[in-house]
Amino acid sequence: MKQSKMLIPTLREMPSDAQVISHALMVRAGYVRQVSAGIYAYLPLANRTIEKFKTIMRQEFEKIGAVEMLAPALLTADLWRESGRYETYGEDLYKLKNRDQSDFILGPTHEETFTTLVRDAVKSYKQLPLNLYQIQSKYRDEKRPRNGLLRTREFIMKDGYSFHKDYEDLDVTYEDYRKAYEAIFTRAGLDFKGIIGDGGAMGGKDSQEFMAVTPNRTDLNRWLVLDKTIPSIDDIPEDVLEEIKVELSAWLVSGEDTIAYSTESSYAANLEMATNEYKPSTKAATFEEVTRVETPNCKSIDEVAGFLSIDENQTIKTLLFIADEQPVVALLVGNDQVNDVKLKNYLAADFLEPASEEQAKEIFGAGFGSLGPVNLPDSVKIIADRKVQDLANAVSGANQDGYHFTGVNPERDFTAEYVDIREVKEGEISPDGKGTLKFARGIEIGHIFKLGTRYSDSMGANILDENGRSNPIVMGCYGIGVSRILSAVIEQHARLFVNKTPKGAYRFAWGINFPEELAPFDVHLITVNVKDQESQDLTEKIEADLMLKGYEVLTDDRNERVGSKFSDSDLIGLPIRVTVGKKASEGIVEVKIKASGDTIEVHADNLIETLEILTKK
């Protein structure tokens, strides 16, 4: 493909509105352009990468018997009313009316549609399992689109749905998808973790998220690609290294979620679901009496602990929530933070939100900072983190402004349900006892759910079993954010290319090192002087030879300065660069492997053999 025929509008500078490096580079390198807020056009390079990722998915899904189809994006609202999600999905749902004033939506996901199609076609267990998927644009009315393709109003998604006679059958397909996802993301060159996830609005029973790990900004060996003029990072002057560090830190660490993972095992979970090893501790032998003490102007845990000269871990934090219109008290030790998702899941609540101080005063008779679990009405449910049960002679609010209780003991002074509702901390022991927990930012790229009968129950999707009894179909749901894969790949494969000029000045510039399977082309063939006939002839020969061997070639035939061509090449990020330059008359070209920065001169007749050795193909 001739570059002069392609739409690749590269920019000389980073876009001013970009905050994450993936957004900046995909715009600057000419992969995408924003049409309006949260809506992007995928230009030829991006489209080629996305199509390659689709090919990987199709190949892996075929192995597990998943069949591709295509459902409409424009959906009748009646289907969503049938499932109950039309009212509960929230403001992200695009709602519209046709000329007859009938209600429609633009689909953000397609559980209802697939359930209806299968409900109307499948009547017996003998017709199951069914494993269907589609690759399609989805729509969500994001309040604040941001970070390029990571938070958009229109996005490309692979959503799959499986249908089963029972949970045992679902478990088999769920495991097939888990392995397929691992194969897909591995082939795509992504550093990812499969983590314990939250079903959220999808209504899942069990779920696993797949997160692309966002690299930190401190490892220079990971970020820098050195030109042949620079032997190693140690040869870069300290002042230049400081400039590089400033440039790296200027970009936000991308990722909407924090991952907690073990340093020594495969354990990994979204921070919302992460837990740690818990071993009950021994309580004090003697319990003190509850005593009310004055704590003037002390509202925070730190203030109370300081005033009473005690360790903060000897205090009970009392929080008030409203869960489905009912008050719920959450108790934690000291400065532990409540994990809203854990609490909501334990309560099986549809809605959970912190109570207002006015509500607290109505229930407790006191404001925030003086709340406690002692002498609460029986109608108030108390959920305590499991660490609270290990406390003895603790301090809690006295439900009177300006006062606290000392000598508070669980079970004797209050009754609670004990469960893990705290947010884990970095450095704590992994729940499997292997290694400690570390945190990283992550981009969600996939999610699999065991939906169970959530949709088949509400929509009447039933089958007759072996005994002629009618049972709801058991479902699974499997999503991959196809368009955000482009962001994740660029986030992980962005690099700073560093070189030294003939005068000894150091230069560095951003670019991409695409993994081979997702690169829009395999080889960037650059002609330094397009007006030189020998160069042109050699370029055409090399292009033909490469294509004959199955290489996809982008040939830069533009009449541009060589510096501009090399700059664009670094931005575009193809794995191999072949330059036809000053030695064209001798048949010699320069080959550069982008990932390592290694360069070598070879004769054109030996180019294919050399590439096979260098790329280990």
UniProtKB/Swiss-Prot annotation:
User: What InterPro entries does the record tag this protein with?
Assistant: aa-tRNA-synt_IIb, aa-tRNA-synth_II, aa-tRNA-synth_II/BPL/LPL, Anticodon-bd, Anticodon-bd_dom_sf, Pro-tRNA-ligase_IIa, Pro-tRNA-synth_IIa_bac-type, Pro-tRNA-Synthase_IIa_type1
* Enzymatic reactions: tRNA(Pro) + L-proline + ATP = L-prolyl-tRNA(Pro) + AMP + diphosphate
Query: Which Enzyme Commission number(s) are on file for it?
Result: 6.1.1.15
Q: Which EC class heads this enzyme's classification?
A: ligase
Lipoprotein found in the keyword field: no
**Which terms does the record give in the GO molecular function aspect?**
aminoacyl-tRNA deacylase activity; ATP binding; catalytic activity, acting on a protein; proline-tRNA ligase activity; transferase activity
Q: What is its main location?
A: cytoplasm
Q: Which UniProt keywords apply?
A: Aminoacyl-tRNA synthetase, ATP-binding, Cytoplasm, Ligase, Nucleotide-binding, Protein biosynthesis
One Gene Ontology cellular component term attached to this UniProt record is: cytosol
Q: Which CDD domains match?
A: ProRS-INS (cd04334), ProRS_anticodon_short (cd00861)
As for subcellular location, the record says: Cytoplasm
Q: Name one GO biological process term.
A: prolyl-tRNA aminoacylation
Summarize the subunit comment: Homodimer.
Domains: entry comment: Consists of three domains: the N-terminal catalytic domain, the editing domain and the C-terminal anticodon-binding domain.
Q: What NCBIfam families does its record include?
A: PRK09194.1, proS_fam_II
As for what it does, the entry says: Catalyzes the attachment of proline to tRNA(Pro) in a two-step reaction: proline is first activated by ATP to form Pro-AMP and then transferred to the acceptor end of tRNA(Pro). As ProRS can inadvertently accommodate and process non-cognate amino acids such as alanine and cysteine, to avoid such errors it has two additional distinct editing activities against alanine. One activity is designated as 'pretransfer' editing and involves the tRNA(Pro)-independent hydrolysis of activated Ala-AMP.
Instruction: Give the family from UniProt.
Output: Belongs to the class-II aminoacyl-tRNA synthetase family. ProS type 1 subfamily.
Xref: HAMAP family: Pro_tRNA_synth_type1
Q: What is this protein called?
A: Proline--tRNA ligase
